[in-house]
C-alpha cells in the first residue's frame, strides 16, 4: 500500500497534468494552491487515520473537510492514487464507494448508495460537474460521465454517459478507425 506522502504526491501530479498540461515541480506547486487541494489532503489524512484506527482523528478530518471545503466524503470511501478534486464544493461521496486510480471529479458531484448498493469506479475516470452516480453501477476504466448526468446503469470502459437518465455513448473513433470499422 502506498504511503500517505506518495499518494498525495500522485494526487497533485495528476492535478498538475490536468490543470497545466505537465507535472513539473512548478505545476505541482501551483496545483497545491488550486480549488480542491485542501479537500484532497483532508480526505487523504482521513483515509490514513482510518487505516490506523485513529477514529477521533479520522472524524476530525472528515468534519474539517465538510466545514472548510464543503466536501463530504464518507469515512470508508477508498480511492487509489491520483484522485483529482477539480473543485471540491458540493462533492458528496458515500462511505462504501470504491474508486480506482486517477479519478477526476468536478464540483457538485454525488456518488451514492441506492437501497444499500454503491457504485464502483475504475481507473482513469472523469465525472463532470453536477453528475450523480447512484446505486450498484460500475464505471469502467477510462469512462467519462458528462455534466449533470444521472447514472443508474453500468458505463463500460472507454464509454461516456450523458443525460438524465444517462445514456451510454460508445467512444468516438478517429478518422482512420472510422473507415476500418465501416
Enumerate the predicted regions with their spans.
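Terminal amphipathic alpha-helical/low-complexity segments used for targeting or macromolecular assembly
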Residues: 1-69, 176-182
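Left-handed beta-helix
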Residues: 69, 74-75, 80-81, 86-89, ...
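Short aromatic-enriched loop/helix-cap "lid" or pocket-rim segments at secondary-structure transitions
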Residues: 172-174
Amino acid at each position: 500500500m502506498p504511503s500517505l506522502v506518495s499518494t498525495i504526491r500522485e494526487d497533485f501530479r495528476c492535478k498538475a497534468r490536468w490543470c497545466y498540461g505537465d507535472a513539473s515541480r512548478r505545476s505541482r506547486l501551483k496545483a497545491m494552491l488550486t480549488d480542491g487541494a485542501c479537500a484532497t489532503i483532508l480526505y487523504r489524512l482521513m483515509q490514513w487515520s482510518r487505516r490506523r484506527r485513529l477514529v477521533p482523528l479520522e472524524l476530525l478530518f472528515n468534519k474539517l473537510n465538510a466545514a472548510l471545503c464543503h466536501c463530504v466524503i464518507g469515512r470508508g470511501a477508498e480511492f487509489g492514487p491520483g484522485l483529482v478534486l477539480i473543485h471540491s464544493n458540493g462533492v458528496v461521496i458515500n462511505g462504501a464507494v470504491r474508486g480506482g486510480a486517477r479519478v477526476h471529479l468536478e464540483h457538485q458531484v454525488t456518488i451514492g448508495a441506492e437501497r444499500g448498493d454503491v457504485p464502483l469506479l475504475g481507473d482513469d475516470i472523469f465525472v463532470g460537474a453536477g453528475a450523480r452516480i447512484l446505486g450498484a453501477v460500475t464505471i469502467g476504466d477510462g469512462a467519462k460521465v458528462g455534466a449533470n448526468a444521472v447514472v443508474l446503469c453500468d458505463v463500460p470502459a472507454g464509454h461516456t454517459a450523458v443525460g438524465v437518465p444517462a445514456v451510454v455513448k460508445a467512444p468516438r473513433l478517429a478518422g482512420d478507425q472510422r473507415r476500418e470499422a465501416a
